[in-house]
Amino acid sequence: MTFAALQEQLSEHIYHFNHGNHEAAYQFLGCHKVDQDGVTGYRFAIWAPHAANVYILGDFNHWQNEPLSHIEGGVWAGIIQGAERSQCYKVGIDHGNGHIEYKIDPFGFNFEIAPKDATVVWGLEDFEWSDQVWMNQQWRKNSVHSPLNIYEVHASSWRRHPDGRTYTFAELADSLIPYVKEMGYTHIEMMPLMDHPLDASWGYQITGYYAVCGRYGTLEEFKDFVNQASGSSWTGCLVISAVMPMPWLTMMGRQPSNIKTSTAPTTWGGGRSTST
């Protein structure tokens, strides 16, 4: 695919992104499967406005730096025809001083399980939701006068296998949903399920906002869990932590001036705090 074709695909997205009114940046940034004009592979798009160069490297190119093209507005992109689903990759950020830092893709849909830290090639596959009955019920429900009894769950510690393994989404569906029903709850509130390397953070030190934690399963398996919960007439609530990310794993290019980091100990279990 030519530079002009990439620019045509991304230009409008980039315009709205840089004007602060793109409501679904995950639809163009990150890794997306393409099949157009005889080209089949994955398109990688990275926002790194201060980088001198940006590279993609992974299983598909023997972990050699593959340069991306600067499209416009700080977005770098390229097509990797040899990339396949489930392969690992990282992003190389060249600061222009001879130093390249290797980062995860902050818009990745899947990641390796910690302590490994590569992003995994993954697409947004078509999925059949089965929650239409539940959705229709919400329009007729009087929320003010309906029962409300919320059960908050930390998926990693709610139950564990004897060998210490966490329950997967499929196992949570088989055990958590019946338990909530038996105990008379109306809502299930899941503490953050987005990708995070440290269980002890309760999911609040997030590295991948667009991926579920691989210790529980895949994005598709999470959707199955939601289908089963809504099929049992439960409302799901998902806690999202947007104030305690781990930017030193994802920051693209030179550190923006509005992000300050400190190495002082924090009460959240980390050795570095972040403020904007």
Describe the residue ranges of each PLM region.
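The feature marks proteins involved in alpha-glucan
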Residues: 1-41, 63, 70-152, 157-164, ...
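Well-ordered beta-strand positions
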Residues: 47, 69-70
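Substrate-binding/active-site clefts of carbohydrate-active enzymes
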Residues: 132-145, 150, 154-276
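Short proline/glycine-enriched turn/loop motifs at strand-loop junctions of beta-rich domains
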Residues: 47-54, 61-63, 83
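Short loop/turn segments at connectors of secondary-structure elements within structured domains
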Residues: 50, 85-87, 184
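A short beta-strand segment in extracellular, disulfide-stabilized domains
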Residues: 43-45
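Glycine-rich, histidine-containing beta strand-loop boundary motifs that form or position
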Residues: 58, 80, 93, 192, ...
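Short beta-strand elements bearing conserved aromatic residues within extracellular beta-rich modules
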Residues: 54-56, 89
